[in-house]
Design a protein with these regions (language model features):
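Histidine-acidic metal/acid-base catalytic patches
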Residues: 1-83
Length: 83
């Protein structure tokens, strides 16, 4: 989320700077809401790029759910990021 807002080109930024990244956050862009297939960011590709760097740390689901069931939104986000 933060990288897209600040710089864009997420996968290039991950590849260029992964040695300096300690953890990642997810959130839908725009709006910082649930992550899904309608957002600016395609998290399956992003997660594959993160995985390809050998990252062994944490990925925080840090979004503000709009739907009525926050746990269901979290489950969908985890499933989307499970590559």
């Amino acid at each position: 989320y933060h990288m897209q807002i600040s710089e864009g080109d997420i996968i290039r930024t991950i590849n260029d700077n992964h040695d300096f990244i300690g953890h990642y956050h997810t959130a839908g862009v725009p709006g910082r809401n649930e992550i899904d297939q309608t957002q600016e960011l395609f998290y399956p590709a992003i997660m594959k790029a993160i995985s390809a760097t050998g990252f062994k740390g944490f990925v925080a689901q840090e979004f503000i759910p709009k739907g009525p069931n926050p746990l269901q939104s979290l489950k969908k986000a985890i499933d989307l990021c499970d590559v």
